[in-house]
Amino acid sequence: MGLLVWNGAQAAAGKEVPVLSASHVEKGTNPGPYNSDPPTSGQHYASEFEAGFFNEADLTSLPAYPEGYLVHNLEHGYVIFWYNCAVLDEAGCEQLKTGIRDVMEEFDGVKLIAFPRASLQVPLVMTSWGRLQEFGAFDAGQARRFVRANRYRAPEPAAP
């Protein structure tokens, strides 16, 4: 409870994105469109993904429209690190992934997801419910600030 009170008193980080309807849609249907890329709110499925780091190779084993699950995570107070290694060389990609993992570990991975997104024009975009921050280059300090300010800042922060 103390964390929720502290988070409510702290200013949110990142750019504000207008919050869309949070209604549930049937799994397998396209939950979009969304008003940002990646999404920060909107229609979604009634279930979510587990916290953790998803690699590009994981995408083939995931259900269609992963955004439908991930927006539900955002509604539960998650922060998502959306990354695109296609805009980096191999060494840059590994540095980005290592930096993301390190920040996630600092927060014990609680309510944190890293997820690849090919549509990004920058290497990293972090989102929370109604908030978005783009990174032209990884900045661990900025990433930590985003997590501290925005994790649990959502309609259902106490949900798992």
Question: Which role fits each region the language model picked out?
Answer:
Residues 10-69:
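Surface-exposed, low-hydrophobicity interaction/linker segments
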Residues 46, 92-97, 125-126:
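Short, well-ordered strand-loop elements centered on a beta-strand within folded domains, enriched
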Residues 58-105:
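Mid-length scaffold segments of soluble, non-membrane domains
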